[in-house]
Amino acid sequence: LKSRNQGLKISKFMAYLLPVEGKSPVFGENVFLADNATLVGDVVCGDECSFWFNAVVRGDVHYIRLGNRVNVQDGAVLHCTYQKHPLHIGNNVSIGHRALVHGCTIHDNVLIGMGAIVMDGAVVESNSIIAAGAVVLEGTHVEAGSIYAGVPAKKVKNITPELVAGEIERIAKNYVFYSSWFKQKETGGK
C-alpha cells in the first residue's frame, strides 16, 4: 500500500490488495474494505468509500478513479478496457449489489441499481438512477436528472429533487454509516 494508506483500518482477514505493473490501490480517509473485497492495480479512491463483500475492482488493464462516498456493494465488479476505456466515478455514487460497471464515466449523485450493467464509453450524468437489471449499452449518454431502465436501458422518466434526496443521497450516506459498524468491530468497539 502507498504511504497515503497509513492508518487504514482493516480486519485481520484483510481484503485482497494486489499491485499490477508497479501500481497499487490508493485510498483516501475513512475507507472500509470488507474482508474478501478485491482491489488490484491502478485504483485511486477518495474519502469515505466502502468496498463490500465479494466486490472486485480491477485497475489492471486501465486506471480506475473514484470520488468521495462511493460504495461498491456486495458482488459488484468494476473494470476497464485495455488502452481504451478507463473508469471514472464521481462523488456520492452507489454501485448496487452484483452490478457490473465497465470502462465508463459516472458523474456525481448516481445510483446504479442491483444487477445493472453499464458498458464501455457510456456516460451517466449527475443526479440519475440506473434501475436494477438495466443494461446501459456501449456509448450511451444518460441524461442528468433521469431514470433509465430496461434492456437496453432507455429513459423512463425525469427524477424529482425528492427522489435525489430520498434515494441517491440517502443510500450514499447510509453506506458510510454501515461501514462504521464494521470499523468498530475491527478496533474493538472504539
Task: Please state what every model-predicted region is.
Residues 1-12:
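Short, basic, low-complexity termini and linkers enriched in Ser/Thr/Gly/Pro
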Residues 11-26, 60-68, 74-77, 81, ...:
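Glycine-rich hexapeptide-repeat left-handed beta-helix
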Residues 15-51:
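N-terminal segments that cap or nucleate solenoid repeat domains
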Residues 94:
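Short proline/glycine- and basic residue-enriched helix-capping loop/turn segments at helix->loop/beta transitions
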